[in-house]
Amino acid sequence: MKFFIDTADIDQIKAAHEMGLVDGVTTNPSLVAKTGRKFTDVLKDIVQLIDGPISAEVVATDAEGMIAEARELIQYHPTNIVIKIPMTGEGLKATRVLAKDGVRVNMTLIFSPLQALLAAKAGAAYVSPFVGRLDDVGHDGMEGVDEILTIFENYGFDTEIIVASVRSPQHVLRAGLQGAHICTIPYNVIMQLTKHPLTDVGIERFLADWKASQQ
Protein backbone atom coordinates (compact mmCIF):
# COMPACT_ATOMS: atom_id res chain seq x y z
CA MET A 1 0.00 0.00 0.00
CA LYS A 2 1.27 3.45 -0.89
CA PHE A 3 1.40 6.19 1.73
CA PHE A 4 0.56 9.76 0.77
CA ILE A 5 0.80 12.53 3.34
CA ASP A 6 -2.22 14.78 3.70
CA THR A 7 -0.77 18.19 4.45
CA ALA A 8 0.56 21.39 2.94
CA ASP A 9 3.11 21.88 5.74
CA ILE A 10 6.51 21.49 4.12
CA ASP A 11 8.22 20.65 7.43
CA GLN A 12 5.82 17.77 8.01
CA ILE A 13 6.37 16.54 4.47
CA LYS A 14 10.15 16.66 4.96
CA ALA A 15 9.96 14.78 8.27
CA ALA A 16 7.80 11.99 6.85
CA HIS A 17 9.91 11.87 3.68
CA GLU A 18 13.06 11.32 5.75
CA MET A 19 11.41 8.19 7.21
CA GLY A 20 10.65 6.90 3.72
CA LEU A 21 6.91 7.24 4.23
CA VAL A 22 5.91 9.63 1.45
CA ASP A 23 4.93 8.14 -1.90
CA GLY A 24 2.86 11.22 -2.71
CA VAL A 25 1.14 14.29 -1.27
CA THR A 26 -2.46 15.46 -1.11
CA THR A 27 -3.40 19.05 -0.39
CA ASN A 28 -6.62 21.03 -0.33
CA PRO A 29 -7.52 24.71 0.10
CA SER A 30 -8.09 24.29 3.85
CA LEU A 31 -4.67 22.70 4.39
CA VAL A 32 -2.96 25.42 2.35
CA ALA A 33 -4.79 28.13 4.30
CA LYS A 34 -3.39 26.72 7.56
CA THR A 35 0.15 27.41 6.35
CA GLY A 36 -0.53 31.12 5.87
CA ARG A 37 1.39 30.96 2.59
CA LYS A 38 0.48 31.46 -1.06
CA PHE A 39 -0.72 28.28 -2.72
CA THR A 40 1.75 28.62 -5.58
CA ASP A 41 4.69 28.96 -3.18
CA VAL A 42 3.58 25.87 -1.25
CA LEU A 43 3.19 23.90 -4.46
CA LYS A 44 6.64 24.88 -5.72
CA ASP A 45 8.23 23.67 -2.48
CA ILE A 46 6.40 20.33 -2.55
CA VAL A 47 7.27 19.70 -6.19
CA GLN A 48 10.96 20.27 -5.46
CA LEU A 49 10.93 17.84 -2.54
CA ILE A 50 8.69 14.95 -3.58
CA ASP A 51 9.02 12.86 -6.73
CA GLY A 52 5.55 11.35 -6.78
CA PRO A 53 1.88 12.24 -7.28
CA ILE A 54 1.00 15.63 -5.78
CA SER A 55 -2.70 16.45 -5.65
CA ALA A 56 -3.50 20.14 -6.10
CA GLU A 57 -7.15 21.12 -5.84
CA VAL A 58 -9.08 23.50 -8.05
CA VAL A 59 -11.41 26.05 -6.45
CA ALA A 60 -13.64 26.79 -9.45
CA THR A 61 -17.10 25.22 -9.30
CA ASP A 62 -17.87 25.13 -13.03
CA ALA A 63 -16.31 22.70 -15.49
CA GLU A 64 -14.78 25.39 -17.68
CA GLY A 65 -13.14 27.07 -14.70
CA MET A 66 -11.88 23.74 -13.32
CA ILE A 67 -10.29 22.88 -16.65
CA ALA A 68 -8.62 26.29 -16.91
CA GLU A 69 -7.21 26.02 -13.37
CA ALA A 70 -6.04 22.48 -14.04
CA ARG A 71 -4.08 23.56 -17.10
CA GLU A 72 -2.31 26.20 -15.00
CA LEU A 73 -1.55 23.82 -12.13
CA ILE A 74 0.01 21.08 -14.23
CA GLN A 75 2.61 23.55 -15.47
CA TYR A 76 4.32 23.26 -12.07
CA HIS A 77 5.19 19.64 -12.87
CA PRO A 78 3.44 18.01 -15.84
CA THR A 79 4.40 14.54 -14.64
CA ASN A 80 3.67 14.68 -10.92
CA ILE A 81 0.82 17.15 -10.51
CA VAL A 82 -2.57 15.47 -10.10
CA ILE A 83 -5.64 17.69 -10.33
CA LYS A 84 -8.00 17.33 -7.41
CA ILE A 85 -11.62 17.91 -8.44
CA PRO A 86 -14.74 17.66 -6.24
CA MET A 87 -17.37 15.05 -7.02
CA THR A 88 -20.10 17.09 -8.73
CA GLY A 89 -21.73 17.03 -12.14
CA GLU A 90 -19.45 19.85 -13.25
CA GLY A 91 -16.52 17.98 -11.78
CA LEU A 92 -17.37 14.91 -13.84
CA LYS A 93 -17.49 17.04 -17.01
CA ALA A 94 -14.09 18.52 -16.24
CA THR A 95 -12.63 15.12 -15.37
CA ARG A 96 -13.78 13.64 -18.67
CA VAL A 97 -12.11 16.43 -20.67
CA LEU A 98 -8.88 16.39 -18.66
CA ALA A 99 -8.58 12.60 -18.68
CA LYS A 100 -8.88 12.56 -22.48
CA ASP A 101 -5.97 15.02 -22.57
CA GLY A 102 -3.85 12.76 -20.36
CA VAL A 103 -4.22 14.83 -17.18
CA ARG A 104 -4.58 12.72 -14.05
CA VAL A 105 -7.53 13.61 -11.84
CA ASN A 106 -8.08 12.78 -8.18
CA MET A 107 -11.83 13.04 -7.66
CA THR A 108 -12.34 14.12 -4.07
CA LEU A 109 -15.19 14.38 -1.57
CA ILE A 110 -16.41 10.88 -2.40
CA PHE A 111 -18.96 9.63 0.11
CA SER A 112 -20.57 6.69 -1.67
CA PRO A 113 -19.50 3.77 -3.87
CA LEU A 114 -21.78 5.05 -6.63
CA GLN A 115 -19.96 8.39 -6.67
CA ALA A 116 -16.69 6.48 -7.00
CA LEU A 117 -18.14 4.47 -9.89
CA LEU A 118 -19.16 7.65 -11.72
CA ALA A 119 -15.70 9.13 -11.19
CA ALA A 120 -14.03 6.02 -12.58
CA LYS A 121 -16.32 6.04 -15.62
CA ALA A 122 -15.39 9.70 -16.24
CA GLY A 123 -11.72 8.70 -16.32
CA ALA A 124 -10.46 9.73 -12.89
CA ALA A 125 -7.05 8.26 -12.08
CA TYR A 126 -7.87 8.33 -8.37
CA VAL A 127 -10.95 8.52 -6.15
CA SER A 128 -10.77 9.77 -2.56
CA PRO A 129 -13.48 8.38 -0.26
CA PHE A 130 -13.61 10.41 2.96
CA VAL A 131 -13.86 7.69 5.60
CA GLY A 132 -13.49 9.83 8.71
CA ARG A 133 -16.28 12.19 7.76
CA LEU A 134 -18.55 9.23 7.10
CA ASP A 135 -17.69 7.85 10.53
CA ASP A 136 -18.63 11.23 11.99
CA VAL A 137 -22.23 10.86 10.79
CA GLY A 138 -22.65 7.30 11.97
CA HIS A 139 -21.61 5.36 8.86
CA ASP A 140 -18.72 2.92 8.52
CA GLY A 141 -16.47 4.75 6.09
CA MET A 142 -14.20 1.76 5.55
CA GLU A 143 -17.13 -0.42 4.55
CA GLY A 144 -17.63 1.96 1.64
CA VAL A 145 -14.00 1.49 0.62
CA ASP A 146 -14.52 -2.26 0.52
CA GLU A 147 -17.55 -1.80 -1.73
CA ILE A 148 -15.62 0.49 -4.08
CA LEU A 149 -12.83 -2.07 -4.33
CA THR A 150 -15.34 -4.76 -5.27
CA ILE A 151 -16.98 -2.60 -7.95
CA PHE A 152 -13.64 -1.63 -9.49
CA GLU A 153 -12.50 -5.25 -9.50
CA ASN A 154 -15.79 -6.40 -11.04
CA TYR A 155 -15.41 -4.09 -14.02
CA GLY A 156 -11.65 -3.82 -14.38
CA PHE A 157 -11.29 -0.11 -13.62
CA ASP A 158 -7.70 1.12 -13.35
CA THR A 159 -8.77 3.94 -11.01
CA GLU A 160 -6.88 3.78 -7.70
CA ILE A 161 -8.53 4.34 -4.33
CA ILE A 162 -7.00 6.92 -2.00
CA VAL A 163 -8.43 6.36 1.48
CA ALA A 164 -8.85 9.94 2.75
CA SER A 165 -10.04 11.72 5.88
CA VAL A 166 -7.95 9.27 7.87
CA ARG A 167 -8.32 9.86 11.60
CA SER A 168 -6.52 6.96 13.26
CA PRO A 169 -4.15 4.02 12.75
CA GLN A 170 -7.23 1.78 12.63
CA HIS A 171 -8.23 3.37 9.33
CA VAL A 172 -4.78 2.59 7.92
CA LEU A 173 -4.91 -0.98 9.20
CA ARG A 174 -8.31 -1.65 7.67
CA ALA A 175 -7.23 -0.08 4.38
CA GLY A 176 -4.26 -2.44 4.26
CA LEU A 177 -6.38 -5.48 5.08
CA GLN A 178 -8.91 -4.55 2.40
CA GLY A 179 -6.27 -3.98 -0.24
CA ALA A 180 -6.81 -0.25 -0.81
CA HIS A 181 -4.19 1.15 -3.14
CA ILE A 182 -3.28 4.26 -1.15
CA CYS A 183 -3.87 5.93 2.22
CA THR A 184 -3.38 9.66 2.52
CA ILE A 185 -2.50 10.25 6.13
CA PRO A 186 -2.09 13.38 8.30
CA TYR A 187 1.33 13.77 9.88
CA ASN A 188 0.04 13.20 13.42
CA VAL A 189 -1.45 9.84 12.42
CA ILE A 190 1.77 8.86 10.64
CA MET A 191 3.61 9.43 13.91
CA GLN A 192 1.03 7.35 15.78
CA LEU A 193 1.79 4.47 13.41
CA THR A 194 5.40 4.44 14.62
CA LYS A 195 4.45 3.95 18.26
CA HIS A 196 3.46 1.05 20.52
CA PRO A 197 3.66 0.99 24.35
CA LEU A 198 5.63 -2.27 24.32
CA THR A 199 8.21 -0.73 21.99
CA ASP A 200 8.84 2.01 24.56
CA VAL A 201 9.04 -0.56 27.37
CA GLY A 202 11.48 -2.64 25.34
CA ILE A 203 13.75 0.33 24.65
CA GLU A 204 13.79 1.30 28.33
CA ARG A 205 14.66 -2.27 29.33
CA PHE A 206 17.44 -2.59 26.76
CA LEU A 207 18.95 0.72 27.85
CA ALA A 208 18.73 -0.21 31.53
CA ASP A 209 20.38 -3.58 30.89
CA TRP A 210 23.12 -1.94 28.84
CA LYS A 211 23.78 0.67 31.50
CA ALA A 212 23.98 -1.98 34.22
CA SER A 213 26.37 -4.12 32.18
CA GLN A 214 28.78 -1.21 31.68
CA GLN A 215 29.21 -0.33 35.35
Swiss-Prot record:
Q: Which family does the entry's similarity section mention?
A: Belongs to the transaldolase family. Type 3B subfamily.
GO CC annotation terms, alphabetical: cytoplasm
Domain of life, per lineage: Bacteria
Pathway note: Carbohydrate degradation; pentose phosphate pathway; D-glyceraldehyde 3-phosphate and beta-D-fructose 6-phosphate from D-ribose 5-phosphate and D-xylulose 5-phosphate (non-oxidative stage): step 2/3
The cross-references to Pfam families, in alphabetical order and at most eight, read: TAL_FSA
| Major site of localization recorded for this protein | cytoplasm
Q: List, in alphabetical order, the Gene Ontology terms for molecular function in this entry.
A: aldehyde-lyase activity; transaldolase activity
Q: What does this protein do?
A: Transaldolase is important for the balance of metabolites in the pentose-phosphate pathway.
Its name, as the record gives it, is Probable transaldolase
Where are the catalytic residues? 84 (schiff-base intermediate with substrate)
Q: What class of enzyme is it?
A: transferase
Give the InterPro entries listed for this entry: Aldolase_TIM, TAL/FSA, Transaldolase_3B, Transaldolase_3B/F6P_aldolase, Transaldolase_AS, TSA/FSA_arc/bac
One GO-annotated biological process of the protein: carbohydrate metabolic process
**Compartments where located:** Cytoplasm
* Reaction equation(s) it catalyzes: D-sedoheptulose 7-phosphate + D-glyceraldehyde 3-phosphate = D-erythrose 4-phosphate + beta-D-fructose 6-phosphate
Output the PROSITE patterns linked to this UniProt entry.
Answer: TRANSALDOLASE_1, TRANSALDOLASE_2
For this protein, the Enzyme Commission number is 2.2.1.2
Print the keywords alphabetically: Cytoplasm, Pentose shunt, Schiff base, Transferase
